[in-house]
Structures are given as structure tokens and as C-alpha cells.
Design a protein with these regions (language model features):
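Catalytic-site signature of metal-activated, phosphate-bearing donor transferases
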Residues: 1-153, 159
């Protein structure tokens, strides 16, 4: 997938993103998640197309931010599922990396993810648009997800203290 953000192709930090898009009926299954689910090929082989498909949202930044505020509660629910013992035991999504990331300390993981994308994966080469993309999607959004988890934990501990 080729992300275009504020009119600029984000060539660094997260590119390329490979997604399963076309498959025979019954040859793939969808992950059981609230947010950001992926198709997993259960039989057959995959082939990569030579060219990318373009993901360019033409709405304004306010619309994008509002959408991600809504996404954050679903993402926080997914992380809660991953952290629960029953989900971890069942291998809810089969992705060990996602489980490891979910177990990192709140707020640290969003900072570390931003640094990984922006500095190690060279996101800074995408200019001001790249900074905004990696900051908003890699740090701000992930911090909002962590804040939702933190809020839920605080409410849970307040209920047990009563």
C-alpha cells in the first residue's frame, strides 16, 4: 500500500505495507479483532502485484483525527484482549510481535514506535508531511490508545477499592 498524506507519498517509515486483497472464496480468514483486522491465507499461495495501490484520503486533518479518536477505543479493546490470559492462551491473532508490543509499558511503546518509524526507518526523509504523518499516526494515535487503556485501568482499580 502506498500512503499519500497531505499530498505526499510516505516513502519511509512504514512503506511498503503488504496486504492480502484477492483470494479464492474460503481460502482466507479474517482475524477476530475490533480494529485493524487482516486477512490470513489458509490455503493456496500468494502472489505480489508489481505495483502498489494508492491510499490517499482527501479529507482534511480534522476528519482524520476524529476518525482516529474513534479507532483508539477499538484498538484499546484489542490490546485488552491480547493481554487477557484467555486471548494469549488461544493465540488470538497469531502475531507474536503484536503481543510483545501490547506488553510494553504504557506510553513508552508509542514513543518507541515513533522513534523507530521516524528515525530508524528514515521517516524524516518525507519532509514536514512525513513528520506530521509519523507523529500523528505513530505517536499521537498510539498514545491515545494507551491513554484509553490507562483510563480503563484507573476505572477498574477505583471500582475494586470501593
Amino acid at each position: 500500500r502506498r500512503h499519500i498524506f497531505l499530498g505526499r507519498w510516505m516513502k519511509h517509515g512504514v512503506y511498503p505495507v503488504k496486504l492480502l486483497r484477492l483470494f479464492r472464496y474460503g481460502a482466507a480468514r479474517c482475524e477476530q479483532r475490533h480494529m485493524d483486522e487482516h486477512m490470513e491465507l489458509s490455503r493456496g499461495r500468494s502472489v505480489e502485484f508489481e505495483y502498489d495501490f494508492v491510499d490517499e484520503n482527501l479529507n482534511d486533518l480534522g476528519w482524520w483525527a476524529h476518525k482516529h479518536v474513534d479507532y483508539s477505543s477499538r484498538e484499546a479493546a484489542d490490546i485488552e484482549d491480547i493481554l487477557s490470559s484467555s486471548a494469549a492462551a488461544s493465540g488470538i491473532d497469531g502475531q507474536a510481535g503484536r503481543k510483545r508490543a501490547a506488553r510494553q509499558p504504557l506510553f513508552w511503546r508509542s514513543f518507541a514506535y515513533f522513534c523507530y518509524r521516524y528515525f530508524l526507518k528514515l521517516g524524516f526523509l518525507d519532509g514536514r508531511e512525513g513528520f506530521l504523518w509519523h507523529f500523528m499516526q505513530g505517536w499521537w494515535y498510539r498514545t491515545l490508545v494507551d491513554a484509553r487503556q490507562f483510563e480503563k485501568q484507573k476505572k477498574g482499580s477505583a471500582n475494586t477499592e470501593r
